[in-house]
Amino acid sequence: MRIVFCAALVAAACAPGEKPRPAGPAQKYAGTWEGRSFRSSSDTGTPFRIVAHVADDGTLRSTLLFTTLPAPPIPIRARQVSDTVLVNEIGPYHSPAANADVVTVTTGKLRGDSLNGTFEMRPASGGNAIMNGTFRTRRITP
């Protein structure tokens, strides 16, 4: 009986485990990011926080929170992820700046722990852009 148990133990110890997935570009965007969005050069900006993680399937999963408003987390869908560029679709959500239900597309360029870029906001029901601007973020935790 001991021999069978020891053989089973050795076989289990030598069996290949789950292979770690190679880190893809999504891993570069994981973490907590804080930033501001700006509608114009004179705008002081709307503060926000993004919390992002890489799911088991390797995709980037994120939510956005406006840090000065009592609102639920807003879902973010990564549409394009590369080593240096991230394109996200945010929402739908109610924009306090536009006072409308909207979907926002962002295009950001990664440099170290900074992700900066542009955004375009459209009505959630479709149609032309109702707001454009820029954003700046910095990763505060990996």
Give the positions of each predicted feature.
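N-terminal regions of proteins, emphasizing targeting and processing segments when present
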Residues: 7-8, 85
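Sec-dependent signal peptide recognition
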Residues: 1-7
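C-terminal motif of bacterial Sec signal peptides marking the signal peptidase cleavage site
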Residues: 11-13
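Outer-membrane beta-barrel biogenesis signature
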Residues: 20-22
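Central antiparallel beta-sheet cores of small beta-barrel/beta-sandwich binding domains
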Residues: 25-110, 118-119, 124-142
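Bacterial signal peptide processing site
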Residues: 15-18
